[in-house]
């Protein structure tokens, strides 16, 4: 058991930062990112013996995190809660940066799931198109289209919010 723990920690340490960024961006508006990380890591550790390819540990964590979020969404829908807590702690030094990050995460939350995940993995986590295609089991061209469409929709969403703010100040 101690050997499993050591191996798990050895695999987790180098992927902690990208995993945390993924959870922050992906969990926005659904649950607190630290809760997502903890639940994902608990599941990953208890089912660690099922990991067949240790070099794909980060993908393994992403898959679990996505399923945890899906289950969370189903619980919320089943319980018929009318509102989801949209407060997520974002650790950025400047207030302007925090506000911009908050706006970006709100806009990302509006995008369709596939476009949102592709953008998060590519722009925030730093994955290549090829890695995302492998993770999502799609062609690289399909991922490029998701990224392109997602960026366009994100631009429209953020532009319309900026225009509405500018109009409010006039």
At which residue positions do the language-model features occur?
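A short pre-motif secondary-structure segment
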Residues: 118-122
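Acidic, proline/glycine-rich intrinsically disordered inter-domain spacer in sigma factors
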Residues: 85-109, 141
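C-terminal edge and immediately downstream basic/flexible tail or linker adjoining helix-turn-helix-like DNA-binding
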Residues: 2-8, 134-135, 151-170
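Arg/Lys-rich amphipathic alpha helix in sigma70-family domain 2
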Residues: 52, 63-83, 97
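Sigma70-family region 2
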Residues: 2, 41-56, 75-76
């Amino acid at each position: 058991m101690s050997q499993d723990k050591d191996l798990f920690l050895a695999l987790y340490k180098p992927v902690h930062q990208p995993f945390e960024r993924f959870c922050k961006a992906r969990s926005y508006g659904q649950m607190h990112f630290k809760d997502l990380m903890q639940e994902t890591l608990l599941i990953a550790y208890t089912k660690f013996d099922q990991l067949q390819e240790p070099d794909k540990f980060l993908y393994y964590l992403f898959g679990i995190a996505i399923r945890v979020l899906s289950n969370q969404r189903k619980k919320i829908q089943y319980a018929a809660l009318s509102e989801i807590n949209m407060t997520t702690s974002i650790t950025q030094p400047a207030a302007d940066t925090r506000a911009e990050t908050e706006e970006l995460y709100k806009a990302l939350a509006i995008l369709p799931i596939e476009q949102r995940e592709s953008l998060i993995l590519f722009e925030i986590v730093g994955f290549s198109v090829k890695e995302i295609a492998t993770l999502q089991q799609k062609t690289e061209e399909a991922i490029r289209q998701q990224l392109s469409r997602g960026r366009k929709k994100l631009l429209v969403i953020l532009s319309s919010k900026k225009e509405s703010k500018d109009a409010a100040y006039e």
